[in-house]
Amino acid sequence: MLSSPTVILQPYGLPVYPQTASCYPGIVQGAAAQEAGPGNGDPSLPQVYAPPPSYPPPGQAPPTPAARLPPLDFSAAHPNSEYADHHQLRVYQGPQHDGTESITASNTDDSLAPVTSDPQSLSVSVASGSGAAGGSDEEGGGKAQPKRLHVSNIPFRFRDPDLRQMFGQFGKILDVEIIFNERGSKGFGFVTFESAVEADRAREKLNGTIVEGRKIEVNNATARVVTKKPQTPLVNAAGWKINPVMGAMYAPELYTVASFPYPVPTPTLAYRGSGLRGRGRAVYNTIRSAAAAATPAAVPAYPGVVYQEGLYGAEVYGGYPATYRVAQSASAAATATYSDGYGRVYATATDPYHHSVGPTTTYGVGTMASLYRGGYNRFTPY
């Protein structure tokens, strides 16, 4: 007999406190009624381990504890309490079906849905009803919506009353319009019906008919897409040269126009049209005219463009007297020592850098080539 209670763990992990046989002779595990293990001759000693439970082999479902749990069926409640041992188990029962009462109760939630036994007939009836409703809406919209027809290739003598009389037999016409220009009718027009159905009927009847030897065409009028044309920018003949900054560098001849709106720099105004030529670059004119900037003078100009380049003027051809050249100021003419073009290198004075070349009227191509081959070059470094 044990002197103190001993805690024994079963395979399920629940502690079991063994008691002596004198206290609970019929409840203690491992009593004399059970199988005695080896060395279990004393009936007062408890059975230490219970027999291991049996597990199903792999791949099979575990057996249902039919002997311990009641069947879970949706049957009526058990008023007699057959399962007294399982008083904590709640048995759920399904709803009671009593014929027409359940149908009436279910229809209270959806009272608008038709009650039919055939779902196919239900879908057909609903579809036919919606189709009828859609057709009525479409028909009503067609009657209320006006429609415009485009009539082309009509006789040129036709006027609005003639076109109204031709289409008025098919329905009420809201508007008739024939397009005209300064020479008369353009041969087409528009007819607006109050109803789209009447417009379609008129289009089917009159399209392709012969009226006074002309086959008219009647079609549905479509909205014209109106596109706004871009505004043409204000440019002159020179295009991009209208900018005063760009024109001063690349097109100084624009500043010789008397009506040009932009202000003209003082050196350019003083030596406009003078003999100080420099391939049309404003930088040369500014440098060469710096000495006479203090005494500017007005420059008479022709009504047209006074050319800055000698290649553009009449002096490019050579042999013309000075009276036929571009008008220039007195101050500019006094200091003019360079040629108007490439044909005459020196016109009024000698070159201070080369004393062997004297004043001359013009040089030919051969003479110019010989001068350059002979060492004449103002920009030579030595």
From Swiss-Prot:
It comes from the Eukaryota. Residues 49-65 have a biased composition (Pro residues). Keywords: mRNA processing, mRNA splicing, Nucleus, RNA-binding. One of its GO terms (cellular component) is nucleus. The record marks R148, F156, R157, N181, K186, F190, R214, R224 as: Interaction with RNA. It is found in: Nucleus. It holds the Pfam family RRM_1. Residues 34-79, 94-148 are annotated as: Disordered. Residues 147-223 form the RRM domain. The keyword Protein biosynthesis does not apply. One of its GO terms (biological process) is heart process. Residues 101-110 have a biased composition (Polar residues). GO terms for molecular function: mRNA binding; RNA binding. RNA-binding protein that regulates alternative splicing events by binding to 5'-GCAUG-3' elements. Regulates alternative splicing of tissue-specific exons. This is RNA binding protein fox-1 homolog 1-like. It comes from Danio rerio. The gene is rbfox1l.
